[in-house]
Curated annotation (Swiss-Prot):
Compartment(s) of residence: Cytoplasm
Name the record gives this protein: Urease subunit alpha
PTM remark: Carboxylation allows a single lysine to coordinate two nickel ions.
Positions with a binding annotation for Ni(2+) 2: 218, 247, 273
Quaternary structure annotation from Swiss-Prot or TrEMBL: Heterotrimer of UreA (gamma), UreB (beta) and UreC (alpha) subunits. Three heterotrimers associate to form the active enzyme.
Keywords on record: Cytoplasm, Hydrolase, Metal-binding, Nickel
Superkingdom, natural source: Bacteria
Active site annotation, chain numbering: 321 (proton donor)
Pfam families: Amidohydro_1, Urease_alpha
Positions annotated to bind Ni(2+) 1: 135, 137, 218, 361
Organism listed in the record: Burkholderia mallei (strain ATCC 23344)
Gene: ureC
Annotated GO MF terms: nickel cation binding; urease activity
Length: 568
């Protein structure tokens, strides 16, 4: 006997299916389910009177043959597609994406459920890969709480705490500081990787930082980003398969942008805040977006361009870079970095895929908990102002959604050599997953899974008789406690450091994972974000022209994902 359900009734019971559309938060962005891996009439769902019961949707198979956890009937949003599926987790990793159930009595089962299987109900939820923020100033450890609660599960950057150097630059300088920060990483339920200071003109001071555990090096103008330092740093990176991130020379003291590009010598490099408000050759650092070896990113305070963007930047910059507003030269330095024309063009360059990544610049001209919010606010603003992208039709914004989700998931992972572990929802990868109610997508996750275990969730009064009574807010879960913390999060290091045995020498508890492939990745590898336009910035007007087209847009006066969701 066949029971026919209306689309509405089906969605209410099992979540959206093929052809159903979902609005992301209160934006104008709509995604459409492209494929449903579950089978109509054979869906599994947990609860009283539901399917996942012994002898029904639950099999008699032993623990070795079933998933540890299954997220049922979820909509996956990732760079590779937008699909409905069950997600299996085994030993802390994504084991399969497909159809869960009891293979003894159900057809098409690719994920076996047994007595050893926990269930997370994904009906009506969107699941994304954990976010990756690659521009972290480790000024305060409390940033990690904010980042994790926003859906970021990996943080890469440098620093030692609220030292003056760290307030301005993302560097963990020298072996002693590197060892201490790696030891501190053991105490936090998030994946971490640290960048050493890359500003040196001879190899030894840089190599010893890589040997101490740095996953890459950071060149920052406040330490002197000269052509000699750039060349030396990239040479060391090539020798050690690590990445280099750069904050270029705003004052053009050691050369203009052309001199910096020449110092790259065609070698791969990650350019931070490539628009320039966060720092970099004034006014035309944006030119580097057209280079095949440059992996460009933005930081979030300029995302998206609004009526308030310019006003807040001056004071922000003075504090972060230890400048004095009473000194004319310091004020001129600050003002040279804040240009409405290049900030407006940055919106469009993101929408067209010329800027490949988005990160925070945490507490140093950036908000650590707003990477994901501001990514989707930019996508919304561009849809409203520019209409559908070429890859989208009238029904959905699937291509735009894939382009923007890639900016804070897979592309940062590829850039920093960690895509073999994190950055997407694919079998074999570490199970860092973020679950969202569509109405709160990008703003407030419902649950964050780290290494297959729930790390943070919205939870009600612990003294209540059920989990939901107020006050409901983010609380750390069992993955953040005791020995589970070290077994559900990763610390990324260089292969040199791993081979040198730093885990035992430093007494580290977390799993150490070496970065790899950092020197072979190019702009062409940036998924959905590989456009290499020829960019010209007018030195007088700051107008930005890409492949002959003037890039300009109006600032937004109102944004979604904002005051509707927050009291403060």
């Amino acid at each position: 006997m066949t029971l026919r359900l209306s689309r509405r009734a089906y969605a209410e019971m099992y979540g959206p299916t093929t052809g159903d559309r979902i609005r992301l938060a209160d934006t104008e962005l709509l995604i459409e389910v492209e494929r449903d891996h579950t089978l109509y009439g054979e869906e599994v769902k947990f609860g009283g009177g539901k399917v996942i019961r012994d002898g029904m949707g639950q099999s008699q198979l032993p623990a070795a043959d079933v998933a540890d956890t299954v997220i049922t009937n979820a909509v996956i949003l990732d760079h590779w597609g937008i699909v409905k599926a069950d997600i299996a987790i085994k030993h802390g990793r994504i084991a399969a994406i497909g159809k869960a159930g009891n293979p003894d009595i159900q057809p098409g089962v690719t994920i076996a459920i047994g007595a050893a299987t926990e269930i997370i109900a994904g009906e009506g939820l969107i699941v994304t890969a954990g976010g990756i923020d690659t521009h972290i100033h480790f000024i305060s450890p409390q940033q990690i709480d904010e980042a994790l609660a926003s859906g970021v599960t990996t943080m890469i950057g440098g620093g030692t705490g609220p030292a003056t150097g760290t307030n301005a630059t993302t560097c963990t300088p020298g072996p002693w500081h590197m060892e201490r920060m790696l030891q501190a990483a053991d105490g936090w339920p998030i994946n971490l990787g640290f960048l050493g200071k890359g500003n040196a003109s001879r190899p030894q001071p840089l190599v010893e930082q890589i040997e101490a555990g740095a996953i890459g090096l950071k060149l920052h103008e406040d330490w002197g980003t000269t052509p000699a330092a750039i060349d030396n740093c990239l040479t060391v990176a090539d020798d050690t398969d690590t990445q280099v991130a750069i904050h270029t020379d705003t004052l053009n003291e050691a050369g203009f942008v052309e001199a910096t590009v020449a110092a790259f010598k065609g070698r791969t490099i990650h350019t931070y805040h490539t628009e320039g408000a966060g720092g970099g050759h004034a006014p035309d650092i944006l030119k580097v977006c057209g280079e095949a070896n440059v992996l460009p990113s933005s930081t979030n305070p300029t995302r998206p361009y609004t009526i308030n963007t310019l006003d807040e930047h001056l004071d922000m910059l003075m504090v972060c870079h230890h400048l004095d507003p009473s000194i004319a030269e310091d004020l001129a330095f600050a003002e040279s970095r804040i240009r409405r024309e290049t900030i407006a063009a940055e919106d469009i360059l993101h929408d067209l895929g010329a800027l490949s990544m988005l990160s925070s610049d945490s507490q140093a001209m950036g908000r650590v908990g707003e990477v994901i919010i501001r990514t989707w606010q930019t996508a919304h603003k561009m849809k409203v102002q520019r209409g559908a992208l070429a890859g989208d039709g009238a029904r959905n914004d699937n291509f735009r959604a894939k382009r923007y989700v890639a900016k804070y998931t897979i592309n940062p992972a590829l850039t920093h050599g960690i895509a073999h572990e994190v950055g997407s929802i694919e079998p074999g990868k570490w199970a860092d997953l973020v679950l969202w109610e569509p109405a709160f997508f990008g703003v407030k996750p419902a649950m964050i899974v780290k290494g297959g275990m729930i790390a943070v969730a919205q939870m009600g009064d612990p003294n209540a008789s059920i989990p939901t009574p107020q006050p409901v807010h983010y609380r750390e879960m069992f993955a953040t406690r005791g020995g589970a913390l070290a077994r559900t999060s990763l610390t990324f290091v260089s292969q040199l450091a791993l081979d040198a045995g730093i885990g035992a020498r430093y007494g580290l508890a977390k799993r150490l994972v070496p970065v790899r492939g950092c020197r072979t990745v190019t702009k062409r590898d940036m998924i959905h974000n590989a456009w290499q336009p020829a960019i010209r910035v007018d030195p007088e007007t700051y107008d930005v022209v890409a492949d002959g087209a003037l890039l300009t847009c109006e600032p937004a006066a109102v944004l979604p994902m904002a005051q509707r969701y927050f009291l403060f």
